[in-house]
Amino acid sequence: INYRRLSVTGAAHSALLEPILDRFQDACAGLHAEPGQIPIISTLTADVIDESTLNQADYWRRHMRQPVRFIQSIQVAHQLGARVFLE
């Protein structure tokens, strides 16, 4: 798993992102997710999602701007039997 530590003091998901949302959505238009082997639970919707959702640029735009439903997503994962979580 590749990662990069970000120099931020808090989560974004706010109106401060409005100026970049169009460009961000355009950048996401080329994404191509493949079917996964384990469920992915969206912190945007608190539902299990598949590659068709992950391939929608508008999904990522909304994900950048809308509130995170972290607790609800963890509850869904727990209901599905998960006991270890990776964010």
Question: Predicted segment positions?
Answer:
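Acyltransferase
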Residues: 2-87
